[in-house]
Amino acid sequence: MEILNTIESINFTTLFILFIGLKFTIETYLKYRNINSIKQNEGRVPKRFENIVNSEEYKKSTDYNLDRLKFQILVSFVSIFILLLLTLGGLLSWLTQIVLGITSSNILGAILLGFFIIIISEILEIPLAIYSTFVIEEKYGFNKTTKKTFVTDIIKNLIISSVISCSIYAVVIGIIENLGSNWWIFAFGAVFSIQLIIFFLYPVLIMPLFNKFEPLDDEQFKKPIEKLLEKVKFKAKGLFVMNASLRSSHGNAFFTGFGNNKRIVFYDTLLETITPDEMEAILGHELGPVSYTHLSLPTIPQVEFS
């Protein structure tokens, strides 16, 4: 009983504000530490890279990273603003009243409410996306995104986010209505399961909506990669090249999916600028976390969200 009384006496609004404030403070502190570290070494190419990177390229790299870090802090501010606007600002209550005036169905109401929230969030985040793509990325010569691609991406994101989020809301409301006082256990399990399914299907259903993926056929890259994968006993469903040049000149390689659906993806921009030996080194860097089972860590945010 004492525990129950203690729980009932907790001011959850205060806890909510403290949690959000603490999270933002820690993240911002770490970003400022990175900013200060970059500034301390600004203008001085590290000795081990003096024969690889010239001072002009190094300055461009540091300036770009500083701009990105400052932008990330701004994004954190905006995210908190949207969250507080929805909760403490009363926007969520206002939207709920609108939904109640449209339908008496709890499930349909949850779907409409989720859709309204996504629409508002997307609209508020558009200026940030524009600044990131057409100001920062453009400034440093990385942007290749056309206005048409930018708008198309927003529409696709909106549709996909709406379908996934509204489906989750409908499932949770259905569980609340039908499974009694222990609904939260079943809701947690359902949300977590849906997220794992999405994580599994993401590389084969969602990613192809935004980019084209072709099998890696270049033998000078493919052979050393397959040899390295065999050495570390990493089983991938395939090696793919993504048309990242549609949006950016950045080069990258990454893993996606899990279980029997793991894939290795290379940006086409990366293959255009490196040698097979360099590719093997890059992939070795990416494979490192596999040896320490870091690929299972994405499930932690899923648990937190659930």
Task: Give short role names for the model-derived ranges.
Residues I3-L295, S306:
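Polar-ligand-bearing catalytic/cofactor-coordination segments
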